[in-house]
Amino acid sequence: MKKILTFVAALAVAGCGGSDAEAPTPAAEVQQAANSAVAEAGEGNPAAALAAQEITDDYMRGIIAEISDDRYEGRGPGSRGDEMARAYLAGRMQELGLEPGAADGGWEQPFELVGVNAQQPESWTFTGHDKSMTLKQWDQFIVSSGVQEDRAVIEDAELVFAGYAIEAPEYDWDDFKDVDLEGKVLLIMNNDPDWDPDLFGGETRLWYGRWDYKYLSAARQGAVGAIIIHTSPSAGYPFQVVQTSWTGVQFELPAGDEPRTQMNGWVTEDTARELVAMAGYDLDDLREAAYNRDFEPVPLGITTSLAMDVEIRRVESANLLGLIPGSDPELSDEVVVYTAHHDHLGIGTPGEDGDAIYN
């Protein structure tokens, strides 16, 4: 299996390099090293040898150009374009000599997805301390349904600042401290504490720093809602990405018995600053407190209600599984898995040029 790992890693390098064979430039040196690696990987492995010859810069660009064509309609999950992309990519795998890897002997591993389309409210109001603040959808907040039902509802729920909303026994970290958060809406910092290189991987984002962990963590505490404070440094992208990717249909695996919030959302940093100021707090001070292991949730004395209609639809999609058998019998039961996604956002709201396909 080591040969498989070397082979695929080398292809990744080769696919990113140029096809020109000029001069001793750094790119050329990388390409030459990749060529040597794939040649070694192909010894005694026909599929690897064929792939080493076929996977070139032009080949990879051709695949990307094909599936990003308008004919694939943006490859939305469960769509006609998704099905077309799977069929096309399975054909390319077969051409390269890969073997079908699905349990039924085929290329596809089918699964069900649930499309959740929350009807965004125009505004969201928070009240407390003889004050009221109404947030504007899109500019200040984006919210989605946490449930796979036709309506999501929060009624008179208190807003609580929950730090990073992390429970990590291996790091001796617990942001909740057994505080009862049943029925609350949690205001949560993005990412994880990075002040210690030995804590939460330092600047490396772990599972604890992901938005999906935050929402799941809030649900485990019995919260009815979770709002993440967006900053570009903590997210790694601007609020515009939240605006475009968290509106419209959100695809999820079918819900099981796990706890779920009613609603999950994002607010801008300036909006969060105004919200906590209603309760007499400074956002920077709350952040500083959340950097410590002794942090405890901070009730803000602010309540909110919100109801959204939700459209639910179920679709079928599939994973594509292609296998390159290894040559070492002692490692034949081990598998090195490389993953990527072929689907995308499909067809959405037209842009200024009238184009609605997210290629």
Annotate each PLM feature:
Residues V13-G15:
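C-terminal motif of bacterial Sec signal peptides marking the signal peptidase cleavage site
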Residues I67, M93, T268, E316-G351:
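Acidic/His- and Gly-rich active-site-bordering loop/insert found
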Residues R220-P233, Y237, S245-A318:
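Long, well-ordered, tryptophan-enriched scaffold segments
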Residues K136-A255, R260-M263, P325, D333, ...:
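Extracellular/luminal Protease-associated
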Residues E22-A102, D333:
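N-terminal hydrophobic or amphipathic helices/low-complexity stretches enriched
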Residues E66, E73-D198, V298-G301, V310-I312, ...:
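Noncatalytic luminal/extracellular "stalk/propeptide" segments of secretory-pathway proteins
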